[in-house]
Structures are given as C-alpha cells and as structure tokens.
Amino acid sequence: MPPAVKAVTFDAATWRDLGPRMLELERQEWGPRAFSPREMRWQATNRDAVVMTTWDGPILIGFAVAGPAWTDGRASLLNVLIDPAYRGRGLVWPLIAAVERALFARGIRELDIDARVENGFADNVERHYGSRATVIEQDHPSPYGRQRTIRVRVAAKAGRRAPKATRSSRGGKRPAESR
C-alpha cells in the first residue's frame, strides 16, 4: 500500500505526539542547522499553518508546513521533509499538492518555496510546476546552503491526475469532460 497523505491540525497534544518525529526528521536533514524545537512547534501549531503529513502505516515519514507570508493571498512553504529511507519515490509532490489544495480552499493563490539548489530540489520544483512556477530570487546563499526562491501559482486541483482521453462515437480520441 502506498504511503498516505493526511492533513493534521496541530494543538499541544498533537505536537507532543508528532513533534519528536518531526524534529528527528529535521535533525537528520540539517544537523546543527536544524530548526529549533521552538521554531518547529511554532510552524506546526500556528493557527494559520497548513500541515500535511505522509505516513507508511503508523510511521510518519514526511511532512510539509506552509504558513503565512507578509502579503495577502500568499503563503510560504516553511518546511518540507521526507525520511531519507523513502526519498526518490516522488512522495514530496503529493504532499505539496495537498498543501496547495488546502491553501486554495483558504483563498491563497501563491506559494513561495525557498528550494535547496545543492540537492536538485530547486530544479525539480521548476520542472514539476512548469508554467505555474516563477523564479523570484535566483540562487542565493542562506544558512541552509544555496537556495532559489520560486513562486508557484496555487491550483485548486493540484496533484490530481487529468482524466484519461475517451473515444468518441466516431472513433477519434477526445478529452473527457472536466469541470
């Protein structure tokens, strides 16, 4: 069974349950540069945050947190991590797509992503989002290594597969109707 993406609304009890694993993933990735427990808790429990998690059965294997930006209608992807043992399977995209759908439902139409350059994530973000992505700040130094800031136009149906083409009565292909 493929890993499942779930929305989580954080409160103090949820943080006590999931916070340690989120911090573990953060420290695995960033070592001494990892966000502090206080910062991670603020990100997850902020009332304006959107938190999505990825699970392999009972094991939390990834999460994404988006929070408010300084501009109306825009959010920032504050954190996104996948357990190193699960990387390379495309799990980050359904996770971010779930964040997008939740943001869209709240009226947010843009998501800023500070994407790491060194591991190829910045290039992958641009490739994945195509015309919905605009580089707003080229590769620049940060405490986390070189990053590229990419603004993504949020889509209501982010991550949903397009309907397959169907055959018309005349035998030609036509796209299935979508709304």
Residue map of PLM features:
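Conserved active-site alpha-helix within GNAT-family acetyltransferase domains
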Residues: V117-E137
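Short acidic/glycine-enriched loop/turn segments that link adjacent beta-strands
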Residues: T71-G73, N119, P141-Q147
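Conserved acetyl-CoA pyrophosphate-binding loop and the N-cap/start of the following alpha-helix
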Residues: Y86, G90-A98
